[in-house]
Amino acid sequence: MTVARVMVPVLTLMNANGSVDEGACSAYAERAGATWLDLFLVSGTIGGGESSTPTVRRRVLELWAARVPKDRLLACVWAPDDLAHAADCGVRPIVVLRDLADAAAMHSVLAELPADAFVYSHPNYTPTTFTPAVAETARRAGMQPAGGKICKVSLDDVRDLRAATGDGFQLYDGRCRHVAESVRAGAALMCDERGVPCHLVCAQAEADAPTEHRSTGDDGLAVVVDLPIAPVIDLSTRRRIA
């Protein structure tokens, strides 16, 4: 698997009748795949995954997996069927932690995850989140996930999570308000929940970013949220407009 440096949530482009706009999604995926960005999160919150159906999520994942190398994709898992869909497509799952009452429930979920799975931890979805204490227990028990997008955490939390998980865990801080500090604290790189990265890959842009914006794998900071790429998506409707 590629060790991702920049994770970008992508949109789900829909027709006015509520069906997947397969032509727009396909063109969007092809354009995204031609950029320098490392990893694309399919059917996440920005992609409307929470409110879409398993059938829609499956079809969108199929479209992306046919056009972008699978090791550059993460399939957001909102329901059990999504996990099977990700396996069918050969895409790494990122499992949303939902409605976990306590640490024991969390550990039960972690114990059942595929070895390459990521987790998506957000207090909006579960009262028990992926904390440093949970992470340390999971690591000692041999059930630590491969990585995770961990939301609503402080810089101290990022440092503690990095210490608890070790260097092999791909840690993504779900906030984008303190990018450099988060990377120094141990995060791999940022995910932007405000929609900015969607503009980076919605694109009328050259495939190669300027040298100073590329992710080389050696940079202390490689995320960019201000490339000169014209958006072609109406974010309110998730439909192509140009």
Predicted region positions:
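C-terminal alpha-helical cap/extension of soluble enzyme domains
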Residues: 2, 7-11, 28-29, 35-37, ...
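Active-site beta->alpha loop and helix N-cap motifs at the rims of alpha/beta catalytic domains
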Residues: 2-130, 134-142, 146-147, 231-240
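Catalytic alpha/beta core domains of metabolic enzymes, predominantly
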Residues: 112-118, 122-218
